[in-house]
Amino acid sequence: MKMDRHPAASDILQHLQGQRDELIRLLESMVRVESPSDEPGTQHEIREVIAAEFEQLGFRVHRIPGRNSGGMLYASYPERARGAKAQLMLGHYDTVWPLGTLDNMPFEVDGDIIRGPGVYDMKGGIVQVLLALQTLRYFDIKPKVYPAIFLNSDEEIGSRESGRYISALAVHMDRVFVLEPSLGLDGRLKTARKGIGRFTVTVTGEAAHAGLDPGAGASAILELSHVIQSLFALNDFDKGITVNVGTIDGGLRPNVVAPKSQAVVDVRVSTQAEAEAITASILSIEPAIPGTSLNIDGYFGRQPMERTPANRQIWQLAHRLGAELGLELEQGLAGGGSDGNTTSLYTATLDGLGPVGDGAHARHEHLLISKTLERAALLSMLLVADKLE
């Protein structure tokens, strides 16, 4: 559709409100291909389903193989000039759901609701990207900042393989839009995310017979109990600092003083300064029981996504464009991490642009069609925006 001017927000919204059937078609084609993170062999089919849609839109698609994951997909405009600024749409096509989930949790359309494994987190976000790009083509709009897309297959297990690609791309981007689900049924955008640290505490004690000579032993379990109390004392809920000992293991038999014990700890913070301070506190814990020793390993695999000046700027842009669409957008802090935590270290990042719905990682996972089409309209307008100052 040729136009002499850029379409108004109302034109874009009206067009996308007519794309309900296309949204359902695209989403069903992806959800029916199950793609659990821990089954890399399942990822190739879903990647091809998605790649075909981008190629149909004229994008050059690069399939990046993975060693321990199902690989990645990078799509870009072939006519992008060397050195020209780009904007990245970021997402993942892996899900937490095991093979066979569709047998008892099928893809289902019920009025304005779509249910199924991965519809909300986050195959619906990939559909939004496609709908937004289709909309730009429909109105014959050429964005001044070239759009690119990166999708990985290991986000749900920490992006250990794809993280370096994401960092390398983010450095060269004017901005990044993360198509993870929005926050809550009111659809808040995620302008901050907590950083996530993972630490493993290993205690070594001395085995002894629990009845004949307990004094000759040094209980690794007793020592671990002291460490756990020290760890929980680091919680500061007012600041949003959470320290959780999620798993513990140890001992040989009931009648043996435990020579070994171990705990795995999840830590979440809102700022880089808090991450550094709490890391130092955890690593400085000393054993309290004579005859025991401690080894604590760990780090923050996802740094906090903070409300930096660049992130505030892109939020203000989204808020203004949302108002043009008649949307009253709100922002929020997410307790979980995403690949947006990584890109935020390098460039302006706006997260939670994906579907409006509920039930990520839960059996009631669903999205709202009408609200998700509105988010596709918002993404369309963001893609057309000028380069950030």
Regions found by a protein language model. Name each.
Residues K2-D11, P65, W97, P181-D186, ...:
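Metal-dependent amide/peptide-bond hydrolase catalytic core
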Residues K2-P117, Y138, K142-P143, G340:
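Acidic/His- and Gly-rich active-site-bordering loop/insert found
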Residues L90-G91, F150-N152, F177-E180, T202-T204, ...:
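Short beta-strand segments
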Residues M122-A192, D236, K387:
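Acidic/histidine-rich catalytic neighborhood of metal-dependent amide-processing enzymes
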